[in-house]
Structures are given as structure tokens and as C-alpha cells.
Amino acid sequence: MLDERSVPEESKDEGADENHEHKGEEFGQGVLSLTGVYNTANHLYNNNIFFSNIISMPPKRLPVSGSEPKFTQVMWGRAIGINNNNCYAYAVGDYEKKRSYKSVPGERAGLNTSGSSYLSCKVLPKMVVADNPKKVYISNAEEKCKPGYYKVMMFLSPGVRTYFKQGDFHFYKQHSVVEYKAKKGNTYEEIANFFKVPLARVKKAGGTASPRPGKILKFKCNVFSHKRGWATGPLLTDAKGNVIIDPRKASKDYGRLNYNKYCSSFCVKNRGIKVGHTHPKVGKKTG
């Protein structure tokens, strides 16, 4: 609801006619405007389109294949998972208990992974595919991945070409089912509104009159998640705390790093992906 104090009242001077010669024209324009409003309203009514439906329309979600990994904090949200798996490893599902340094696109393929390559959307997508050539292919955001694959998006924070700030990449992955751990004070309405899903779906997942703190609610939900390097567990929210429906429209500004450059979308096989230095290089018997 708008704060009435933020809406200035129109003064008599501001609302008065400054040029009486244009009164007739304004009246004619008003008649045309009213006619247009009537025609629009008549069209909406005849087609069973109501204002309440328009303002409550759910956000457009990108298609899913049905092979998306479930969103969960299990493993990834624990200390070992947080400290050894960055956004790239998380997005492609390559969980490791110990890594000496963060996974970089192209590293497993033996390609040049110097910092300057992080500034090029022409280079990075090819490096991602090269790491798992038989299990990753370039797609587009609106395309449904084939069965057994799910969507991943990559963005860049361009940065400045210096030794200390070379830009950075960031990945998001799609889910069709989420696990949510109910917190004290949560209501089903609050959870449903946050995820933008039907209330009945969340209530069914809860199974009780109100959410029991600590209970894991599992329900269908088409969203994206990400992981901020080795600093966080899996996140369903963007830089402004909103659930991520489409990463391209989400806030990605984290101050020093602003991942505002959409680079590419991929379809990733939902098992068997390996990235980084902890695995054998891609060869005839790998991929």
C-alpha cells in the first residue's frame, strides 16, 4: 500500500488551465480517452480478463526438463561443503570434501585459465563445455533441456584489467523441487508468497495446521540457486534478498563484484560432472 504522505496533493494553481484556448481540444482528447478506456474494459470483460487476475499474475518461469537437482542444504550447506565447493562446482553438482583451490572453467580441460579469460563471454562458455564435452552443451535461457539434463546460467563481473581485479564469473542452477527448513514464526502464507507458489502446495508439504520449526518442507518450485564461492552455502535469494525466478532479472550487485553481464546458458547432465584440479584431465577416456 502506498504511503499517502509520499503522494503530493495537486495545488489549485497546478491544476488550473494555463491556456483557455485549448479547453476545447482537451475536452475532445478527454472524450477519446474515455472511449478508449471503455473499449479496453469491454475487451477485458468479453475475454474474461479481470484486473485482479492481471495484478496477481505469477512471474514467468523458465521451462524445466524434470531432471533438475533438488534444492537442498544437505552436504553443500555444511562447513566442508561450503569451504571446498565454489559456484562452478555447485552449479554442475561436483561435490568434493577437499579442494586446494577453487574450480575454474577450462582447468580440467587443460586450457589457459588466466584471469584475463574471465572477461570474455566468447571464451568462457567454450571452456565450460571443454571440461565435460559429452555432458554439457550450450543452450539458451528459454529452451527446455533434454531429459537427464538441467539448466545452468553463467554471468560475468567484468572488473578492471589489473593484477588485483580481473573480473569474475558466477553460476546459477535451476531446480524444480525445493527443500525448505521451516523457521520459528513462519506461516504457510509467508512461505508461499516468498516462493510465489500456491498456498495449498505449501500446506500439503507441511502436513500440520502451521509449520513446525525445523521441519523440512519439500514441494515443487521452479527457481534458481547459487553459491558465493567458499563463503556461503546454497542460496535461493539474490543480492536484494528476493527468490531467484530468472537469474537474468535478479539483482547480482555485491559491491566490488557486480555480475551484470549475462554470458551463456548450458544444459548440464544431472550426474557425473567433474570440474577443477581434483580430477583427471579430459582425455579419450574422460569427459
Regions found by a protein language model. Name each.
Residues V178-K181, E190-C221:
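Extracellular LysM carbohydrate-binding repeats and other cell-envelope/extracellular binding modules
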Residues K183-G185:
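Short gly/acidic/polar-rich coil/turn motifs that serve as flexible hinges in modular proteins
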Residues P213-G287:
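Active-site or metal-binding loop neighborhoods of secreted/extracellular toxin and effector enzymes
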Residues P58-K135:
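Cysteine-nucleophile protease catalytic domains, especially the papain-like/related folds used
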Residues E4, E9-L32:
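Intrinsically disordered, low-complexity, charge-rich segments with an acidic bias
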Residues S116-V177, C221-A231:
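...with weaker cross-activation on analogous glycine-rich loops/strands in unrelated enzymes
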Residues Y38-N53:
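Short, positively charged and aromatic/hydrophobic N-terminal segments
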